[in-house]
Every structure is written in C-alpha cells, then in structure tokens.
Amino acid sequence: MSNLAPLPRQEVSSEERTLRVQLAACYRVFAMLGWTELIYNHITLRVPGPERHFLINPFGLHYSEVTASNLVKIDHAGRAVTPSRWPVNPAGFTIHAAIHAGIEGAHCVMHTHTTAGMAVACSRAGLSMSNFYSAQLHGKVAYHDFEGITVHAGEGPRLLASIGTKPAAILRNHGLLAWGESIPRTFAILWLLNRACEIQLASTAMGPVLEIPEDIQKKCTADSLQFDPRFGAGQDVFDALTRMIDKADLSYRD
C-alpha cells in the first residue's frame, strides 16, 4: 500500500500556504461534485514570485486525498522544486504550463473529463446556445482541435492560439477547460460551462432545441452574477462549497 503520509512540511510563505489550502479545498469540491477521473485531470494554481512556479496535484492520488501539504510545486518544465513522494503527470503540466506561461492573467487553470463535457466536446456542433447556462457564456468559449494525448510541448502554442483571450475552452474530443485570475472565478466559469453541457445532453435527447437569440445571449452574459464583482465573481459560491467540505472532512487543510 502506498504511504500517504506527507513529507515534513516545507517552509512556505503565508500567502503560499493560503493558496495551498484553497487549492486543496477545490480538489475536494471537485471530488464532491463527481468531477474526477480516477487519479487523472488537474487543477493548477500559480504561486506568486518571479519564478512563476505553480501547484499541481500529486500523480497517483485521488482528488479526495489531496491536501495543502502534498500539492507539488513545479516549474514550467514539470520539475518538482520542493520534495515530494509523488510524481507529476506529464499531460498535466503540458496543458497547464502552456496556459500559465502564455496568458498573464491565468493564475488558475482547471481541466475536466466529465461525461457531459466530453459528450459536447465530441459533438460536431459544439456548445448549443439554447439554455440558461450557455446563454451566460456568449463570446467566452474557445475550441481547440484534438491532437492526441497532451504530452507534447509543441501543442502549447497552438492551444494558446485557439484560446486567445476566452476564459473557457472546449477541447474537441477531449473535455473542458477554464482559466482565470483566481480559483473562485475559474470555478464559476467551469461550472457554468459544465452545467450548460449537462442541460444540452438532456435536452437534445428529446429532439430539436430552441436556440436563444444572440442579443439575449449577450444580455445574459452581461447580467450574469458569475462575472459580477459585486457578488464575488464566484467567491461567494466557492466559499459556500468550502464550508460544505469543512463539515465533511478538514484533512485537506493538513
């Protein structure tokens, strides 16, 4: 059996410690929502500092096992810069490192393989602008064609070109991705996109859907609380989910 005990805690700044706890909470939230793929997929978070290091989950642990102290700090070549018993999944840092390095505001990057997200990613038409959730994402979703398992750094520039400045992406035949300046904001975007995919999967099973006019899409996106700083731009939602995690298991804070 693998030894899940962390290495002796490394000295980190109070700011990094806060970010580690928040990122570990996010992994537990994903586990609670069922947004897991065995030990695969990743949520990464840039660590403040000129080195531009970022935190990633240890490869081999389920999201429900991630804690603040066992998160691995790596550079953009995927090398651990602090001691860890666990390796890093090459497919994780290939996608995430490209986005962290290429988009200044991409402090957080999330990637999922949910059933609904992958189903829409496999659809020729992509995201249908026909429901309450997709209508809040007008002009915010990019598409990137499938090039195979993402272990080749050469895909990075093409991925960045596909994304441009859009905070969400559907990776064709693959899954969903979102990036943002914080965990709560990135989560809000990904949650909207995944929820839109869930509704699309259910509604299209019943026959043709009713598309929402573009002017209404624009209005919905402008009015969405998910992007409104007055309502936390996702912070209030993430705080509520963190409280749910706290009630169930505080071990993520270790």
Segments and roles (model prediction):
Residues M1-D254:
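Glycine-rich flexible loops
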